[in-house]
């Protein structure tokens, strides 16, 4: 995967879906998008139903007000649904939505740090 950069903020309070969504929805609306990234710099990740059997991470390309748009065709990611080794699922109205640091991002960071250390050790960097 070539997608590396994500947008993060520290002030995104957990919110809820305004209406239910099915597993192929390409956008969703929450009760309050305040504090979430807007995607203008980089895509960001949210988690739906954290801790539930149907927990799903979603790569989001943009947010306008309370409406989030699911990423598609960004850096080799064909769909942002079921991101970070989760599965796309249906979620009911009032399902919890939170901003999250995902394992894919942490793996990308780890690989980049490792690669740079190897280059430094080799005297290339």
Walk through the language-model features, giving the residues of each.
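N-terminal regions of proteins, emphasizing targeting and processing segments when present
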Residues: 25, 101-104, 113
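Intrinsic-disorder/low-complexity loop/linker signature
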Residues: 66, 76, 96, 104-106, ...
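Autoprocessing Asn-cyclization modules and mimics
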Residues: 1-81, 111
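Flexible linker/loop signature enriched in Pro/Ser/Thr and Pro/Gly
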Residues: 84-106
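Viral virion structural and adsorption modules
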Residues: 1, 110-125
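Glycine-centered flexibility motif
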Residues: 24, 51, 94, 123-124
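Generic detector of low-complexity/intrinsically disordered segments
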Residues: 19, 61, 103, 121-124
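Intrinsically disordered, low-complexity regions of eukaryotic proteins
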Residues: 51, 58, 86, 104, ...
């Amino acid at each position: 995967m070539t997608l590396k950069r994500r947008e993060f903020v520290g002030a995104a309070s957990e919110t809820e879906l305004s209406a239910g969504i099915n597993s192929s929805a390409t956008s969703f609306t929450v009760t309050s998008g305040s504090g979430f990234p807007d995607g203008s710099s980089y895509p960001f990740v949210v988690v739906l139903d954290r801790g539930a059997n149907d927990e799903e991470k979603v790569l989001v390309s943009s947010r306008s007000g309370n409406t989030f748009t699911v990423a598609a065709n960004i850096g080799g990611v064909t769909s942002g649904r079921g991101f970070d080794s989760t599965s796309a699922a249906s979620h009911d109205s009032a399902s919890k939505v939170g901003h999250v640091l995902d394992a894919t991002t942490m793996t990308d960071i780890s690989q980049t740090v490792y690669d740079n250390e190897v280059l430094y050790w080799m005297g290339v960097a």
